[in-house]
């Protein structure tokens, strides 16, 4: 009854006003699943390919008509008749049809749209919410939100080099209370910034994007906001960084250039810089602390801080099991960021999560800077027992939609649900 009977696609807009792919998959029960594909601003060099049209006369070359056509003309004929409930077989068919390592023929945005829409159609046909359909009866853990309340780097036009400064409400009893905590700190931060004469416009992910003197000043104003909101730093609320270090790494010179504060580091110097920040502030997680191909500095960072902090590989791993396996083998990082569009199918995403968990790595489900109203990743965070989710600040509907879905899931789970809290961070146990 969950045989795929129709697949269609269209071009829609994401939260940055750029085109993206939306797919609908219909199954024999009459149920339809719809999925919209996200898009990143700072993308890893090793990510699956997001197919764009390249026609500068239309959407500045960012149109996705080619990807849409590939769904309708290439993928649909190949998957109609397949069982949407057999996710692995469906994804394998599309991957084989593409035949390239990075899904560059059909586009990862085309393949992923079909993959996610089919899962949603099958879930509806089985009368199950997506988190239960994908995760089974054991899916009951609500993730800790890593809320990006202050933006720098590629996500904002400012002189702050680190891309994301996040508050982590890990000491609250429920997801709903954690979300309230994050929202109240977000509003308190606006007052703090206004008091300093700083701008309170927001970046791609809903966090403020002020021009501050240094990365450390960004941490200091967030600490002030936590206190003004009435929460205890370190106990109730911690901090997390997404450094996006590949964005400020000079590959030729082998140096990390923090231009906003006029500092230049080699690998050892960068590790010590992070260690000093972690000693001064209640930082529990550092993401993309080193360049995506600087395995040597990643190793140094893991040896120096891996026993104390969560070290997350995003651009380093790009949700790819081959790169993750290398990291596990070399003892690099202790966590992986999970982005469905980095690898381009639900099956491969789930494989990466399983590999990480087997190795004792934590997993963080994540949005992209270009998002839509689609809430799939909220369900996947619960389904995969990730324990943590990154989906932006307490503003912009494209971010809030995911938080609201998690509120619904927590309500639906009732007493069987649990908020991951501090236990989500293995390095803190």
Swiss-Prot record:
Keywords: Cytoplasm, Glycolysis, Lyase, Magnesium, Metal-binding, Secreted
SMART domains for this protein: Enolase_C, Enolase_N
GO cellular component: cell surface; extracellular region; phosphopyruvate hydratase complex
GTP-binding among keywords: no
Binding site for (2R)-2-phosphoglycerate: 163, 339, 368-369, 390
GO molecular-function term, one example from the UniProt record: phosphopyruvate hydratase activity
Entry EC no(s): 4.2.1.11
Chain residues that bind Mg(2+): 242, 287, 314
InterPro entries linked to this entry: Enolase, Enolase-like_C_sf, Enolase-like_N, Enolase_C, Enolase_CS, Enolase_N
UniProt-annotated catalytic positions: 205, 339
Manner of cofactor binding, per the entry note: Binds a second Mg(2+) ion via substrate during catalysis.
GO biological process, one term: glycolytic process
Family assignment from sequence similarity: Belongs to the enolase family.
Name of the protein described by the UniProt record: Enolase
Source organism of this protein record: Anaeromyxobacter dehalogenans (strain 2CP-C)
